[in-house]
């Protein structure tokens, strides 16, 4: 309709109408492509896809955390209470850009971040609780698909992200000054993190595919009825893409959760470490009263990281 209206503009109607019709066809092709891609997922359509993209716009704003100390605001990495989304006995789900600081007794301790939005007490991610959540998620998605209300369920899920109904289990404070980048900062560590951005994709997919047989046994032994019902329903209706998504989702939460790409990156780092130049120190020649001598103490902050101290 908009393209037809553009065509009635005097003098420039013909070229504008053609351009508007071409643009409308491009938008329709893009919409059909997104509908085809998201149609294999439960409760997804183009409108839900756009709402999900719009909901991601609030993430950068939540990545700045401040601490009020005697009326003075300090930028900190410690999560405030408003950033805590969900808590279990050993896991805290929080907004990105911070690390939970939990007070236990008379001492505060930084929890170990295992993901940008997940922190655990000791760095180990318990799989039992996460698999129960996946069981509930898959069961709800199966029910929505069976009742043909997938768009409604997706809308309710997006709106539900604005509200949190979870009792507090831990006392979170902002007096730890936690580090988002835990551990000793080295060149190999930074190289490992950079490799994590591109290397683990194929390894992660292959690892999840290889864990599917064990995941099927865990579904039956652990009585995960929501996942079993989802696999059975999607298999009966012939939607094998959803069956594969459910299997990969359940297999991704292994009993001993670890970063598969991290292991591959560590192996690569072990091989490349043989070619490491090791510690070094820049030597500078200083001219004092016409005589040259070596100044071995002329180090800046960046050079001191390479001396091995």
UniProtKB/Swiss-Prot annotation:
Residues 256-282 are annotated as: HVR1. It comes from Hepatitis C virus (isolate HCT27) (HCV). Residues 50-63 form a propeptide. The lineage of its organism: Viruses, Riboviria, Orthornavirae, Kitrinoviricota, Flasuviricetes. GO terms for molecular function: RNA binding; structural molecule activity. Residues 36-39 are annotated as: Important for lipid droplets localization. The keyword S-adenosyl-L-methionine does not apply. InterPro entries: HCV_Core_C, HCV_Env, HCV_NS1. The keyword Transmembrane applies. Residues 62-230, 252-309 are lumenal. Keywords: Apoptosis, Capsid protein, Clathrin-mediated endocytosis of virus by host, Fusion of virus membrane with host endosomal membrane, Fusion of virus membrane with host membrane, Glycoprotein, Host cytoplasm, Host endoplasmic reticulum, Host lipid droplet, Host membrane, Host mitochondrion, Host nucleus, Host-virus interaction, Inhibition of host innate immune response by virus, Interferon antiviral system evasion, Membrane, Oncogene, Ribonucleoprotein, RNA-binding, Transmembrane, Transmembrane helix, Ubl conjugation, Viral attachment to host cell, Viral envelope protein, Viral immunoevasion, Viral nucleoprotein, Viral penetration into host cytoplasm, Virion, Virus endocytosis by host, Virus entry into host cell. Viral particle assembly takes place at the surface of ER-derived membranes in close proximity to lipid droplets. NS2 associates with E1/E2 glycoproteins, NS3 and NS5A, which interacts with the viral RNA and core protein to promote genome encapsidation. The nucleocapsid buds at the ER membrane where E1/E2 glycoproteins are anchored and afterward associate with nascent lipid droplet to acquire APOE and APOC. Secretion of viral particles is probably regulated by viroporin p7. Residues 1-40 are cytoplasmic. Residues 137-168 are annotated as: Important for fusion. GO terms for cellular component: host cell endoplasmic reticulum membrane; host cell lipid droplet; host cell mitochondrial membrane; host cell nucleus; membrane; ribonucleoprotein complex; viral envelope; viral nucleocapsid. The record marks 49-50, 63-64, 255-256 as: Cleavage. The chain crosses the membrane at residues 41-61, 231-251. Belongs to the hepacivirus polyprotein family. This is Genome polyprotein. Coiled coil: none annotated.
């Amino acid at each position: 309709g908009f393209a037809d209206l553009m065509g009635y503009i005097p003098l420039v109607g013909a070229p504008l109408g053609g351009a508007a019709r071409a643009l409308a066809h491009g938008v329709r092709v893009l919409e059909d492509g997104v509908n085809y891609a998201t149609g294999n997922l439960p409760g997804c359509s183009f409108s839900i896809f756009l709402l999900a993209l719009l909901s991601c716009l609030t993430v950068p704003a939540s990545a700045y955390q401040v601490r009020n100390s005697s009326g003075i605001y300090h930028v900190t990495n410690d999560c405030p209470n408003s950033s805590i989304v969900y808590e279990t006995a050993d896991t805290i789900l929080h907004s990105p850009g911070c690390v939970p600081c939990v007070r236990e007794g008379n001492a505060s301790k930084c929890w170990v971040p295992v993901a940008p939005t997940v922190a655990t007490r000791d760095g180990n991610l318990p799989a039992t609780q996460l698999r129960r959540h996946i069981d509930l998620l898959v069961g709800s998605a199966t029910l929505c698909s069976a009742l043909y209300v997938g768009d409604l369920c997706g809308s309710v899920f997006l709106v539900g992200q604005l509200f949190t109904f979870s009792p507090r289990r831990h006392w979170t404070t902002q007096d730890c000054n936690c580090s988002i980048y835990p551990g000793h900062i080295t060149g190999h560590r930074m190289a490992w993190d950079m490799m994590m951005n591109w290397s683990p994709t194929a390894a992660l997919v292959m690892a999840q595919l290889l864990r599917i047989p064990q995941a099927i046994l865990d579904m039956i032994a652990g009585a995960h009825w929501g996942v079993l019902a989802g696999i059975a329903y999607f298999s009966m209706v012939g939607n094998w893409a959803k069956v594969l998504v459910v299997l990969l989702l359940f297999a991704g939460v292994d009993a001993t959760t670890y970063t598969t790409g991290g292991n591959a990156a560590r192996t690569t780092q072990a091989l490349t470490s043989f070619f490491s130049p090791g510690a070094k120190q820049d030597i500078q020649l200083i001219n004092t009263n016409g005589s040259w001598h070596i100044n071995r103490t002329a180090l800046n902050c960046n050079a001191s990281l390479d001396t091995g101290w």
